[in-house]
Amino acid sequence: MSFRFDRSVFESADFNERLRERLTGALNPKSRRHVERADEAGNEDDSSGHQRKSGGSLDILKNDIIVEKVDFSRIPNLEILDLDVGLGVSSISSGGGGSSMMKGICKISIEGAMLQVRTVIESNLLMLSMADSPEFVTPTLITNDSFSLPITMTFSNIKMEAISKVFFVARNSGIGISFDDVVLDFKFDCSIKILQTTIEKRLKRAMELLFKDTLPTALFNMSQSWFTNSDGSRSSAKHKKDTCDENNQPSAPKIIFEDADLQELSPANMLRLSTLVSSRQTLSLHSTVSSTLSLIPGCLERQNLYRFISRMPSLSNYYSSYVDHKKERAGTPSLLMNKRPSVDYLLRRSSSSGNSLMSSQAYFDKESNLLPMEVLEENAYDLDVITDIQNKLYMRSTDHDEQVNHTKPRRRKIKIGKNKKDKPAYKEEIEQQEPVQSTITVSMPFEEPQIIIEHNDETEAVKEERESVLSSPKLIRSTMDKTYTNSRILNTLLQKNGNLLDEETRLRAQSIDSVAHTKMGYLLGLNHIATPPPPPYY
């Protein structure tokens, strides 16, 4: 088997024109099938009918994709990496002599190519959605017209490198091809600049589908015209392809319920469905169901905003039942109910601010979070309930401040029963002990001493204080870590005139605490008195 490449095919002007026609047919297989069926049936069919794709997404194309211009400034470079030419095994085993078969791996490089396409898209997506929705859930709109946008896309400076696998059997009259390791780069320009970035991202993701399905199909269809010799085989191949297209065509969406099925449905379910449909077709502020906050779970309707706010935890809401019951028994209207704001007032407040829910919530938190006077007078309040309500209001306000100002408020927390870690253990044991009052009495023989005072510079006030202290000294109460004296004048006298005091004064001064007695005995010179040793931290 031999083959050759004719470079003149790529250099001729007809190559770009034929490639443009093939790409246009490959990009619009659905419209081509519609036109063929319309010609066969004898009636014209709208080729721009909107249908859903097999993936479930809406088809926004209102017209065919027309390839306006294709230009290969440079001839594509084709490099054969592997080639296997032989006879088919199935044909040899059947005794038919075999058919020519070729398998090869090639590297394709394209540089400097340009492609320009144009189409018309539908921008009213609501019209496309309602075209496929059942009638019993489709609302009635005042206007739902089409809004078409023509768009032109230009791909310039296309650079592509890919590894392709080619499979050819002469008897099958076609070439099978697949692409692997595709590297593609291009410059994109769109007539609608606001959509250019979005379309470019989606096109780059759609290139995988282009090289896996669209381009191999176009090359296969093109190869059929090259290797088909008889009209019979061409018509049979065309018939097989049309049959395959009809089987692969996505079926139109079907209505779930028919007239016979509606009779078997529950009347209660149909009533709920009709109520749901009617609620979606009205702009009234009055709810269709007064006992519920919202017909749709997780959503809050505007007309039910007041009932939602009235159920928020607050002191007035919690004790309103108590006050209302008391007013009903007394035969007078409730003052608390008269103080509640109207719905119009809440709507005016919500329209003046950006967040209607937070604005109305702030009103109830600040204006209506009041404890009724009747509850205070009759002591009908509960401190635990009031604390719980105030905590919820505080946490709600702090959450709102944290979302708006991005600052977390500080809150003082007191923990009971927590020991201090930095305090020594032996000090805690000492503080738990009760202070002990002790008295030491020393008996010594009394002798009248001779006191000689050479000079006296003391004032009269000091003399009177000294005489009163010496005549009736007081016992000193002390603990293990602190020592108190009853007079600074006594300490001054003992330090300055300790050697000049008589024996009676010495005996009276000895009736003090054990810790103070150690210091006082040292000052008075009573070293023979046995005293306990001082504590380690004294």
Swiss-Prot record:
Q: Which UniProt keywords apply?
A: Lipid transport, Lipid-binding, Membrane, Mitochondrion, Mitochondrion outer membrane, Transmembrane, Transmembrane beta strand, Transport
Superkingdom of the source species:
Eukaryota
Cite a single GO MF annotation. Answer: lipid binding
Membrane disposition: Multi-pass membrane protein
Q: Which cysteines are joined by disulfide bonds?
A: none
Where is the stretch described as Disordered?
Answer: 26-55, 231-251
Q: Which residues form the SMP-LTD domain?
A: 1-224
Keyword set includes Nuclease: no
Q: Name one GO cellular component term.
A: ERMES complex
> Where's it found, cell-wise?
Mitochondrion outer membrane
Record GO biological process:
mitochondrial genome maintenance; mitochondrion organization; mitochondrion-endoplasmic reticulum membrane tethering; phospholipid transport
Q: What does the record's free text say on domains? A: Lacks alpha-helical transmembrane segments, suggesting that it resides in the membrane via beta-sheet conformations similar to those predicted for other outer membrane proteins and porin.
What family, per the record? Belongs to the MDM34 family.
Q: Subunit structure of this entry?
A: Component of the ER-mitochondria encounter structure (ERMES) or MDM complex, composed of MMM1, MDM10, MDM12 and MDM34.
Tell me, what does this protein do in biology?
A: Component of the ERMES/MDM complex, which serves as a molecular tether to connect the endoplasmic reticulum (ER) and mitochondria. Components of this complex are involved in the control of mitochondrial shape and protein biogenesis, and function in nonvesicular lipid trafficking between the ER and mitochondria. MDM34 is required for the interaction of the ER-resident membrane protein MMM1 and the outer mitochondrial membrane-resident beta-barrel protein MDM10.
For this entry, the protein name equals: Mitochondrial distribution and morphology protein 34
Q: Which organism is it from?
A: Candida glabrata (strain ATCC 2001 / BCRC 20586 / JCM 3761 / NBRC 0622 / NRRL Y-65 / CBS 138) (Yeast)
